[in-house]
Amino acid sequence: LTAITLDDVKAYAKTLYEKVYITGMIHGNWSDKEAMQSVDSLLSALGSKPLPENERFEQVVEVMPQGERFRFSREVADNNNSLAYAIQVGEKDFSLLAKASMIASVVESDFYTQMRTNQQLGYIVWSFNQRIEDRIFFRLVIQSSTHGPFELSKRVNAWMASTEKLFSKLTDQEFERHQQSLIVALEKKGDSIGAIAGDLYSLAADEKGDFRFKKKLIQAVKDLKKEGVAKTAGKIFRDDSTPRLEVLMRAKGSKEKVPEGVITETKKFKNQLN
């Protein structure tokens, strides 16, 4: 950034809209004709050419091979260590997405209590399911100024091994409470025209026009059985064939030894995936 001058920015600004690809969502009391007129006005004002499909941004999700476990580590210019765990759950599927969401709801409190309250590993402790494009992941994140990333990894792996007890002790009433909580969250509508427009935009763009996406997911949550959720949790947390990636960031000046087999260059990681 230090090499960029104001003149560079001004020159680039003139070419910024030469070619564009626009995704939009219009929500409100406009007619189809008024909506099209608005779009035409925008395109006319920009004076742009269409951006070719092969030049448009597309988020590419790398797929980890079955049974593979990757560990990547690097020292950073920060006083904190961190562990970011990404467990590859599978391809987008309403049933699998519902199960992953339910599992996230069940483990959230226990993971936080064990990692932050009981073991006091760090201030930031998160667990959540995540969908990127057509892939579902389960994420575990800890930031710590007192424990190195490889120690964090040991603690998290021990916690994952203990999740069998967490799900075997889950009562029908607790399961139904988590289930109902998810349904209520999915059924909640935006409380402003902007929030509603944002939800509709996500359905139009991210879900490719599937405006019944939430209803389908709600039905998938309603169809869940405790045994099926527990089985999927076992595959996510305790099955050696489930692919996973650990990103272990070491604080500046860290003396923690990097174990053998840990990748320290992004290029090597990419090569192992291909």
Task: Give the positions of each predicted feature.
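A structural supersecondary motif
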Residues: 82-88, 104-144
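Short, solvent-exposed amphipathic alpha-helical segments in soluble enzyme
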Residues: 40-45, 102, 157-158
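Active/ligand-binding-proximal structured segments within catalytic/core domains
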Residues: 95-107
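Extended amphipathic alpha-helical segments enriched in small hydrophobics
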Residues: 140-172
